[in-house]
Amino acid sequence: MIKFETDSNGEGVEIIFDSNGIDEFIAYLQSIKKENDHLHLLVGNELSEEKVSDNENTNVKHVKIVYLPRSWIRWTSFAN
């Protein structure tokens, strides 16, 4: 299980994993780094819709994870 929620005031994000979910998430991160790419995680596919607590958090329905190589970050910082 991989789950992203906004906290009750909408200013923070909570990321919740079970044992399999954290392994999947690490694999996603390794893959986008290796491929110099990005990844979309969607509710109903990679992201769980399961309610895991009684708090007032809101499910995040879409997460985009982007890898920016260090050289790109230095270049854009220098250009600005």
Regions found by a protein language model. Give the residues of each.
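Positively charged, low-complexity terminal tracts
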Residues: 1-80
